[in-house]
């Protein structure tokens, strides 16, 4: 009887280990490949596209146009850093003080959860993982974040992040967003336009760059102030991000 019980457990353990090993090889290969090759699509893009098809929205297209950092306005990278992760050039993928503050806040305010994800974590999640909040996904995200921080430069992380970020329904990447909302390439985005796009990033399906609410406008103004405090365009040059 004990042998019959042990055998299935052993099989499941081996199966789980093989799945994890296969995922590690797949994700490791992706990290290595995308360190030099443009990203054709992300896990979030695939998830949105499949969900649309399953919902009968066959006209939905998750659209993105890859551009290099040389073809992105320096204001755009600065705006995203100012809005999402001001310690981006300094940390190794995780902002530990911000995580500690978020945990303390969430213990006091369970109905208003605050995140502390860095740009590196967001990039790992958007590129390789599914939406949602679970300890499994967080654990995988942490491993992938360490992987991209080890293999990619900060400039590469920022480039990939800007190219796969969701800026609206079916709009992925800064080039597609610039063309849709401002009818210009990403290279010509102004300070205010870059700040407006960065302002919707916390929830681009709720906040609209083409119809900004009062909250989005106030966040845009705050981001512009933060951009000035960081040092403006010189911040990007000083940290070798453009």
Curated annotation (Swiss-Prot):
Protein name, per record: Biosynthetic peptidoglycan transglycosylase
Single GO cellular component term: peptidoglycan-based cell wall
Gene name as annotated: mtgA
This protein's record includes keyword NAD: no
E.C. designation(s): 2.4.99.28
Transmembrane segments: 19-39
Keywords assigned by UniProt, alphabetized: Cell inner membrane, Cell membrane, Cell shape, Cell wall biogenesis/degradation, Glycosyltransferase, Membrane, Peptidoglycan synthesis, Transferase, Transmembrane, Transmembrane helix
Functional summary from the UniProt entry: Peptidoglycan polymerase that catalyzes glycan chain elongation from lipid-linked precursors.
A biological process term (GO) from this entry: cell wall organization
Record's catalysed reaction(s): [GlcNAc-(1->4)-Mur2Ac(oyl-L-Ala-gamma-D-Glu-L-Lys-D-Ala-D-Ala)](n)-di-trans,octa-cis-undecaprenyl diphosphate + beta-D-GlcNAc-(1->4)-Mur2Ac(oyl-L-Ala-gamma-D-Glu-L-Lys-D-Ala-D-Ala)-di-trans,octa-cis-undecaprenyl diphosphate = [GlcNAc-(1->4)-Mur2Ac(oyl-L-Ala-gamma-D-Glu-L-Lys-D-Ala-D-Ala)](n+1)-di-trans,octa-cis-undecaprenyl diphosphate + di-trans,octa-cis-undecaprenyl diphosphate + H(+)
Keyword Nucleotide-binding: no
Pfam families from the UniProt entry: Transgly (PF00912)
Family classification: Belongs to the glycosyltransferase 51 family.
Pathway assignment: Cell wall biogenesis; peptidoglycan biosynthesis
Biological source species: Salmonella dublin (strain CT_02021853)
Protein localization: Cell inner membrane
SUPFAM superfamilies in the record: Lysozyme-like
GO molecular function terms noted in the UniProt entry: pentosyltransferase activity; peptidoglycan glycosyltransferase activity
Membrane topology listed for this record: Single-pass membrane protein
Major localisation: membrane
């Amino acid at each position: 009887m004990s042998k019959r019980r042990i055998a299935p457990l052993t099989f499941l353990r081996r199966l789980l280990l093989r799945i994890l090993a296969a995922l590690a090889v797949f994700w490791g290969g992706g990290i290595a490949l995308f360190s030099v090759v443009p990203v054709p699509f992300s896990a979030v893009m695939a998830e949105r596209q499949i969900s649309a098809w399953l919902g009968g929205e066959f006209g939905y297209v998750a659209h993105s146009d890859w551009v290099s950092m040389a073809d992105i306005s320096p204001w755009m990278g600065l705006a995203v850093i100012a809005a999402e992760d001001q310690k981006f050039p300094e940390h190794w993928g995780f902002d530990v003080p911000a995580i500690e503050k978020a945990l303390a806040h969430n213990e006091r305010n369970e109905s208003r959860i605050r995140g502390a994800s860095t740009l590196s974590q967001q990039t790992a999640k958007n590129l390789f993982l599914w939406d949602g909040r679970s300890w499994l996904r967080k654990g995988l995200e942490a491993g992938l974040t360490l992987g991209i921080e080890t293999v990619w430069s900060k400039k590469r992380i920022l480039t990939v992040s800007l190219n796969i970020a969701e800026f609206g329904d079916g709009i992925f990447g800064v080039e597609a967003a610039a063309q849709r909302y401002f009818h210009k390439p990403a290279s010509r985005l102004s300070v205010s336009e870059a700040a407006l796009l960065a302002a919707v990033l916390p929830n681009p399906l709720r906040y609209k760059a083409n119809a900004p609410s009062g909250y989005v406008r106030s966040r845009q103004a705050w981001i512009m102030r933060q951009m000035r405090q960081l040092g403006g365009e010189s911040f990007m040059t000083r940290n070798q991000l453009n």
